[in-house]
Amino acid sequence: MGPNGHRGLQDSGRHGAFPVKVSPPRLTSSTGQRWVILALAYVPLLFNDPGRLAADTKAYLYLDPGRLMERATSMWQPEVAMGTVTHQNIGYLWPMGPYYWLADVVGMPDWLAQRLWLGTVLAAAGLGVQWLLRTLGWGADRQGGWLKANGLQGGILVASLAYMLSPYILNYVDRHSVILLPWAGLPWMLGLTERALRTIGWRHAAIFGLLALTVGGVNASSLLLVGLGPMVWLLWSGLERAVSWRRVLGAGLRIGVAFLTTGLWWMIGLAVQAGHGLPTLHLTENYRVVSDAATAPELFRGLGYWYFYGQGRLGAWIEPSTSYTRWALPLSFALPLLALLGAAAV
C-alpha cells in the first residue's frame, strides 16, 4: 500500500491541482540516499581491522578459490578419507566462488576482497529496501507539499538503513556471510513480485529467477524461509482484491517456473548431499539447540541464531554477542518497540 492509499507502480509525474516544483535536499533525493547507503555499507568495513581476515565460510575461498570451484563441479570428494559426498560446495559456483577467484586473479589482498564482499551484501540489502518502497509508490506523490514529500523520502532512507544495519547481520557477517544473501535479496524479491502482479509478461519473473539463482544454492532453508515473503505477498494481493486472482495465479506460476528453472541444479545437488552425505545437521545443530535460541524476544530484536550465543574457553564465539547480552540489551529491545509504536501511530 503506497502512502497515498494506492498500491502498485505509480506515475511519478502526477501532480495535484497546484503543482509545485520541489527541489529536495540532497539526503532526501534518490541519488543522495544511494550514496549514504553505499558509504555506510563499505566505509566502516574498510576501516575495521585492515589487513586482518575473519574466519568467514570456506577457508579455500581465500587460500585457493580456483581449486574450490574446480572441485565444486563434482558431488564426490575423493581427497577426504576414502571419499565422501561434498557439503554445500556446489553452491559456491555462483556468486561467491567466482568473486573470490576474480579477486585472486587480479591480485587483490584477501582482507580487502572480504570487506568489499561484505559491503556489497549490505549495500544490496539497503538498496533493495529503497527500490521496494519506491516500487510501492513512496516518494512519488508530491500532493502533500514539501513537508510530506521530504518526510516520505526521509522515511525511505531510515527504512533502508534500519534493514541494512539490523542486528541480524551480526549472526552471520564474519562466520557465514553467504547465508546473508537471501536476506539481502528479500526486498528485491518482494518488489519483483509486485511488478509481476502489475504487468503481463515474463520479464520480472525471469529476473526473480536469476535473483534466486544468485542468493540461493548454499543454504536451502534460508532461501525457502525468505521465499515465504513473495508467497504471502501474492496471497494478500488477492485477498485484499488489489488484483484479480487470475493475475495472482499467473504471476505465481511464472515466478515458480523461473525459480525452478534457475534453481534445479543446486536443488538436485543438495538432495544428493542429504541422501548420501554426512548427517551434518545432526552433528552440528539439532532442533532443540536451534529452538532454544530462537525465542520470541530474541527474534523481536533481530537475533535468535544459536551460534550467536556460543561460549568457549577463549570467550564468545562471536564477539559482538557480549554487548548484546549485557549493556546493549535494553537498547536492542527499545528500538524495535519504538518503531512499532511509531508505525501504529501513523
Task: Label every PLM stretch briefly.
Residues R7-F18, W138-L152:
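Intrinsically disordered, low-complexity terminal tails and inter-domain linkers enriched
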Residues V106, L136-G137, L147, V218:
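A broad structural signal for alpha-helix termini and local helix breaks/kinks
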Residues Y42, L118-L136, L152-E240, A251-A271, ...:
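Membrane-embedded helix bundles of polyisoprenyl
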Residues M1-N48, L127, G250-A251, I255-G256, ...:
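Start-transfer (signal-anchor) and selected internal transmembrane alpha helices
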Residues R67-L68, A72-V80, V248, G256-A344:
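Periplasmic/ER-lumenal interhelical loops and adjacent helix-loop junctions
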Residues S30-P65, V257-Q273:
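Transmembrane signal-anchor helices characteristic of membrane glycosylation enzymes that use polyprenol
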Residues S244:
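Aromatic-residue-lined binding/catalytic grooves and analogous aromatic/hydrophobic interfacial grooves
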Residues L40-G126, L161-A184, R288-P320:
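Membrane-interface coil-to-helix junctions
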